[in-house]
Amino acid sequence: MYMKNLNKITKAIIMLGLLSTASLSAFAQDMSNGADNFYQSDSVAMQRVTFKNQYNMTVVGNLFIPKNLDKKMTHPAIVVGHPMGAVKEQSANLYATKMAEQGFVTLSLDLSFWGESEGQPRNAVSPDIYAEDFSAAVDYLGTQTLVDGARIGVLGICGSGSFVISAAKIDPRMKAIATVSMYNMGAVNRHALNHSQTVEQRKKLIAAAAKQRDLEFGGGEIEYTSGTVHQLDKDTHPIQREFYDFYRTPRGEYTPASSSPQLTTHPTLTSNIKFMNFYPFNDIETISPRPMLFITGDKAHSKEFSEEAYRLAGEPKELYYVKGAGHVDLYDRTALIPWDKLTEFFSKTL
């Protein structure tokens, strides 16, 4: 039943303009430009770690430590957040590994309700708890003998870009903030891309979620929404093809033990509506004078969010375009991801 619901919602999203243009091959995975989501490094040690957030929920992460790190000193650290609907094994581990190769202690994490982290129901949306998870990661890193607690930064990919901004506004321990292919998860749910969704259309989505709450409270099955399609056909929109190529092929597909291939990437319908009340860019200027870096592909359908955040943020700030890159390209295409820019940013600011 949930797949029928997903198909209806996907069609509605396309009609609302949430999906725009991009071009990828229809069915075969595209491994161009060094796509290497599951990259591992011989020079970096990884260990699974757990810690509690302030809601006493267990958050699970991977801690990456350069093998040649001077154990007699403390070092800067970076928390890395995965795309919305993904898990740490998708994009976040890659970024954490690559930045550890540059000498940083890094920590990728599963947001609550996703992957190995606690939270019921699975795939639930809670922007406040997501932001809290990043602060909890800073809590954890601050206890590590190799980490300088005054030199911790955050890096959010896709939806996590908006979550790290939300967290950083009220957590000054996050000394430097970077986002890659950021989605403002509040704005995209309220307005769709390019503000193509009307208030009346938004109200229909809210009403549908409220109706579903009644059904589920009465014992009905949980419904899931949005996420990535499971099959392609001639009518599949180019942006869904872009996501499909990562999430539904060996390029980036990963199903954690807490989920199933049918449910990965799909948040629950009744909780996803909470994004309507999520305004991460409000008061973004109060993060200043802590530095911010916004990275987006110049071909990315999502670039409006990085551009808007840059416009609103206080100094120091930088908006960096990756030439020829789309939104999902910056999840794993190692030849396109600007590692030098990220290394320069965090080296100077932490």
Tell what function each PLM region has.
Residues 30-73:
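N-terminal cap/lid segment of alpha/beta-hydrolase-fold proteins
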Residues 73-83:
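Short beta-strand element of the alpha/beta-hydrolase
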Residues 98-118:
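Conserved alpha/beta-hydrolase
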Residues 325-336:
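Catalytic histidine-centered segment of alpha/beta-hydrolase-like enzymes
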Residues 85-97, 111:
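The serine-hydrolase catalytic nucleophile loop
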Residues 165-249:
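Alpha/beta-hydrolase-fold enzymes
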Residues 294-296:
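Short beta-strand/loop motif that positions the catalytic acidic residue
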